[in-house]
């Protein structure tokens, strides 16, 4: 599939790391799956995805891209997000770190193909 240049990139990116106890894994995945399905339909959500670390067990990284800071703020106060936050607070987290990046500019690039 050929990549095309995006017409508008995110103004805000959120990246969060969750290191959870193995016993909470399935519940965590169910929570996140539901939250992602709801959030992807919200105004301004450009993407929202989860990736599992392939080396460290039960370590996950969430990333979100938002068109505007206002869209993200509306998400933060929404009932579905608040419900997810409350449910996550019941988990045993070994670590949780989140960063919000304000994007001032971006440049599209096609990554080079392998040199074979």
Identify what each model region corresponds to.
Residues 8-46:
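N-terminal first-folded block
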Residues 22, 32, 52, 64, ...:
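Generic alpha-helical secondary structure signal
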Residues 7, 34-46, 65-99:
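An amphipathic, aromatic/His-enriched active-site/gating alpha helix that lines ligand/cofactor pockets
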Residues 1-10, 50-56, 86-116:
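Glycine-rich beta-strand-turn "strand-cap" elements at beta-sheet edges
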Residues 2, 36-61:
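Short, glycine- and small/hydrophobic-rich beta-strand elements in well-ordered beta-sheets
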